[in-house]
Amino acid sequence: MRYLTAGESHGPQLTAIIEGLPAQLPLGKADIDPWLRKRQGGYGRGRRMVIETDEAELLSGVRAGRTTGAPVTLAIQNKDHRNWTEIMSPEPGGEPRKKALTDARPGHADLTGGIKYRHKDLRDVLERASARETAARVAVGSIALKLLSELGIEGANYVFNLAGIETRQAFSWDALDAIEDSDLRTPDADAAAQMRERIDQAKKDGDTLGGILEVRFRGLPVGLGSFVHYDRKLDGKIAQACLSVQAMKGVEIGRAFENAVKPGSGVHDAIHYREGTYARDTNGAGGLEAGMTNGEELIVRVAMKPIATLMKPLPTVNVVTHEASDAARERSDTTAVPAAGVILQCVIGWVLAEAITEKFGGDTLPELQERLAAARRYAAEY
């Protein structure tokens, strides 16, 4: 499977084309739009989330509620585009451009992207570099999550840490409703109250906040990925997918950093055979060994830096005059940490769905289900 996205933050729409989805997968807007709404939620979001009410439009590859095997095309309209039609017009003219951005923002793609693509109006960089693009990736990832659910695989995400405030309540699959009901995607009500106070103060200060997200999947078969070549290792693919999301700066699988300072005898997960299957009493590896799923729960933590657009901007340089200036102000969030967990679950879900279709093949969902069931039986009997 593969996909491409296109579109700018204030362009008419975001578009995605997905190739390789098996036919006969039940699919409709009801499988996609709830994930788009989750992405827009969370305490600390900005005014853009009030303007946009994201919905996916399925344009090809789905008929009568099922995939056909043809490429799936979907679009998400940018409602804010009506305020930017002249500024974002593809037609020549209008120089000097309206709302040209020439004061590069530290921490953004602005300066480096401007040099790379020879733009002096840095809006030509930020429009595509914007995290608005993640709406398309959430739509794509939600389809992957739908495929995984049809194969008996379930995912979850929550905020482990926001601005140094940790969720102290250990993750439980029984707490998913509490996570979904929380505007900070944490089951820990006390931690959530502290997080809100920290966000409110940061907003008053014109500052932004980062955090750490945790994503989990259960029900994965043994053997997704490979140890044979570097580019087939699943942990490498997961890390790449996570770090490709705007503002993500670090990835941990299992208890990686905690394990780094321990002796091996206190790190690795002992293997047992009971009740007709292989099992581990601990999961320090986070469900991945040597680039392959081992049948245990997949546990991934991702560090998100604070958003780089500040209401009290940092010093910078104007790329036209080369004079010192303050960084440009753009509408932004105080924090998007809760939404980031949703995005990360979707991008990791895509990697897992891709790995499953690569390993088991098949043109249709029933074929994939049959082959996966056979692989599960073999692993249990091995």
From Swiss-Prot:
Query: Residue ranges under compositional bias (Basic and acidic residues)?
Result: 94-108
A GO cellular component entry from the record: cytosol
Report the pathway entry. Metabolic intermediate biosynthesis; chorismate biosynthesis; chorismate from D-erythrose 4-phosphate and phosphoenolpyruvate: step 7/7
Q: Where, in this chain's numbering, is NADP(+) bound?
A: R39, R45
Question: Pfam family example for this protein?
Answer: Chorismate_synt
Q: Which Gene3D superfamilies match?
A: Chorismate synthase AroC (3.60.150.10)
BP GO terms, sorted: amino acid biosynthetic process; aromatic amino acid family biosynthetic process; chorismate biosynthetic process
Which domain of life does this protein belong to?
Bacteria
What does the record note about the cofactor? Reduced FMN (FMNH(2)).
Region span, Disordered: 89-113
The EC number(s) attached to this protein equal 4.2.3.5
Keyword Metal-binding, does the record have it?
A: no
Q: Which residues bind FMN?
A: R128, A129, S130, Q246, A247, A290, K305, P306, I307, A308, T309, R331
Q: Which UniProt keywords apply?
A: Amino-acid biosynthesis, Aromatic amino acid biosynthesis, FAD, Flavoprotein, FMN, Lyase, NADP
InterPro entries under this entry?
Chorismate_synth, Chorismate_synth_AroC_sf, Chorismate_synthase_CS
The protein's GO terms of the molecular function aspect are: chorismate synthase activity; FMN binding
Q: Which cofactor does it need?
A: FMNH2
**Is Magnesium one of the keywords?**
no
Which EC class does it fall in?
A: lyase
The subunit field of the Swiss-Prot or TrEMBL record says: Homotetramer.
Similarity comment: Belongs to the chorismate synthase family.
The protein depicted here goes by the name Chorismate synthase
Gene symbol of the encoding locus = aroC
